[in-house]
Amino acid sequence: MARKPVELDFESTLAQLEAVVTELERGDLPLESALKEFETGIKLAKQGQERLQQAEQRIQILLQKSDTAPLTDYSADE
């Protein structure tokens, strides 16, 4: 059953996206239902990405207003 994404917090968005992925991975949905689930998943992924970008912007603003160390890119090699 296709879910309608509404404005959710990040954790709820991620949980719904995981449910959509699980349902699609089962592979037993009719084509039309699978397409609706896929569309819902795309919308949820976009919503989650937007939430992450907003959080990153807030962190950057907070760091600029404080006297803490500058924000640097993460590198797994370090």
UniProtKB/Swiss-Prot annotation:
A GO MF term: exodeoxyribonuclease VII activity
Gene: xseB
Predominant place of localization: cytoplasm
Lineage: superkingdom: Bacteria
GO biological process: DNA catabolic process
Main EC class the enzyme belongs to: hydrolase
EC number: 3.1.11.6
Role summary: Bidirectionally degrades single-stranded DNA into large acid-insoluble oligonucleotides, which are then degraded further into small acid-soluble oligonucleotides.
Coiled-coil ranges (or none): none
Gene3D superfamilies noted in UniProt: Exonuclease VII, small subunit
Subunit field text: Heterooligomer composed of large and small subunits.
Protein name: Exodeoxyribonuclease 7 small subunit
Subcellular location(s) of the protein: Cytoplasm
